[in-house]
Amino acid sequence: MTKNSTECSPANQTGLERVLRSPAIAGLVLLVSMLVAFFWVNSPFADSYEAIHHAPAAISIGSFELAKPLILWINEGLMIVFFFLIGLEIKREVFEGQLSSPKQIALPAFAALGGMLVPAAIFLAFNNGSEEYVRGWAVPAATDIVLALALLAMLGSRVPIALKVFLTALAIFDDFGTLVIIALAYSEGLSLPSLLMAALGTLALIVLNRLRVASLTAYVLVGVFVWVSVLESGVHSTLAGVIIAWCIPMRVSGREFLHKIEHDLSPWVALLIVPLFAFFNAGIDLGGVDFETFFGPLGLGIILGLFVGKQVGVMLGVGLAVVLRIGARPIEVSWGHLYGAALLSGVGFTMSLFVAGLAFEQPGAVLTVNLAVVVGSVLSATGGLVVLARSYQTSPSLANAPD
């Protein structure tokens, strides 16, 4: 183990660092952010929330100016950092971690694939006849990696470590699939000149990588250029975060480089960026929700997609991998554990809200979809925690383990 990776290990963290990096704390901050937004927008002070939501903000450099409402800076600017971190995690896992061998990949990969296809199929079964609503097919296919892992962390030693590894890998595959969907399904009006500029920026990042440049500033400056080019190209800007991440070298001069960036960035993303996104997107004004639509095909397609589709799809994927003998269930992980994890994968929250914002433009439809995402996610979270708690009670090896 290199010096930097040792410094980043939990054993070398202070008590405060361990708290700040705790998935449970990240989940709590995220939950509080959503609740504050929800109660604020349904209070007599709702106008002040809307004022913050749509406050104008601009970046000016000489004659160049990029002006957008604050909500778009959060969704298209700060969230790039979130997807950049996901890109770093995927690259690290592919080269050195849980996704570095075919046997390790198969089980969570099949689970993630099933967990995306079945929810999408359920949504389309309800909404295939509606040209307006059919764009939302990817909303129930997403998983909130931060909240799902935070819920699992709440159970501590009551769940085996192998289950945490499985859910992490599943969520990484799920996020990768969501990124591909966003790039292919929600990109419009492509601009060839901007795409060429983005390609040139990416080439510059690759050159920096091959030269093993150790200056993070260099990657940031070129990365901003790539982000602006992608933003102007018509391809959704989230793709820029992953492109930049994959151009970061694993090591420079024998020292950890990618892992250190990931380590330093994680608490900022978990405790600031994701909660900010949740705060700006979870303000659901119940007075503006069309409950006829909520209890109709649109709302039910999302709720059932998240709560039913995710668990069915993940378990079908796991079962298929095991039957085909290309993946194996870890010895210490029971089928009950896997079912609980399958339920937790239905916690869509921030990722589903993000996709919903891309799929729908009408405020009424967005509010209805967001409420359906919250309901489906709460049902999945509750079901997952109950199943995992019962699995702990019926697992002698875990029940006798110290908390």
Swiss-Prot record:
Cell compartment(s), UniProt: Cell inner membrane
PANTHER family listed in its UniProt record: NA(+)_H(+) ANTIPORTER NHAA, SODIUM ION/PROTON ANTIPORTER NHAA-RELATED
Q: Where are the transmembrane segments?
A: 25-45, 70-90, 105-125, 136-156, 165-185, 188-208, 213-233, 234-254, 269-289, 302-322, 340-360, 369-389
Care to name a GO molecular-function term for this sequence? sodium:proton antiporter activity
Q: For this UniProt entry, what is the primary localization, expressed as one broad class? A: membrane
**What is this enzyme's catalytic activity, as reactions?**
Na(+)(in) + 2 H(+)(out) = Na(+)(out) + 2 H(+)(in)
Protein name, per record: Na(+)/H(+) antiporter NhaA
Q: Give the Pfam families listed for this entry.
A: Na_H_antiport_1
Any one GO CC term of this protein is: plasma membrane
| Keywords (A to Z) from UniProt | Antiport, Cell inner membrane, Cell membrane, Ion transport, Membrane, Sodium, Sodium transport, Transmembrane, Transmembrane helix, Transport
The UniProt gene name for this protein comes to nhaA
Lineage of the species this protein comes from = Bacteria, Pseudomonadati, Pseudomonadota, Alphaproteobacteria, Maricaulales
> How is the protein disposed in the membrane?
Multi-pass membrane protein
InterPro entries given for it?
Answer: Na/H_antiporter_dom_sf, NhaA
Q: List the disulfide bonds.
A: none
- On the tree of life, the source organism's domain of life is Bacteria
